[in-house]
């Protein structure tokens, strides 16, 4: 009697919930495999419709970070007027080296045609090599000369302007905490050429308080220490 009542209830449930796969077999047992398959399909379908609530961490790219630093307000604390002359010298050597390299194939062609001697060809090659070495040496020196230095309003970021290999202005942004003071760098405050050193890198740049001009001594002291 109890088995008949249970079968009747199962048949009643299977009519109302056919999507869940309830079936009453003659023996009165539910097909568990069929029910498990339909439940898995239902969960998979629900998983497709569920929105993705996972959180994503926004990554700060170096370009956006540099753009943020460039948009800050800076005050000039040091200027080197002779940087314009160094820029002109760098571009002149670049132009001279370019002309020499362009003329070298012409001299070689004239030598093949018998219109230029071996001595002229050797001199042309020597001049081209010398121009290349001089260009590299001058550019190596000029790129390490500080043209201007600025300090932001919070006095935490130092903007350093110098020349690139092509003679263009280039700005780098250095945390003040990363700058080595004059007392720790080993330079005497009375020296003509001082070193701009950082804790995070071995690259060294150079500036001069004699040939250059300290615009804001108080802000300059915040970065490099007192000049007195």
Curated annotation (Swiss-Prot):
Membrane topology: Multi-pass membrane protein
InterPro entries according to UniProt: Tmem186, TMEM70/TMEM186/TMEM223
Location of the protein in the cell: Mitochondrion inner membrane
Pfam families for this protein: TMEM70
Transmembrane segments: 94-112, 119-141
UniProt keyword annotations, A-Z: Membrane, Mitochondrion, Mitochondrion inner membrane, Transmembrane, Transmembrane helix
One cellular component (GO) term of this entry: mitochondrion
Lineage: superkingdom: Eukaryota
Residue ranges, Mitochondrial matrix side: 1-93, 142-228
Stretches in topological domain Mitochondrial intermembrane: 113-118
Chief subcellular location: mitochondrion
Family the entry assigns: Belongs to the TMEM186 family.
Function comment: May be required for efficient assembly of the mitochondrial complex I.
This protein's name: Transmembrane protein 186
Gene coding for it: tmem186
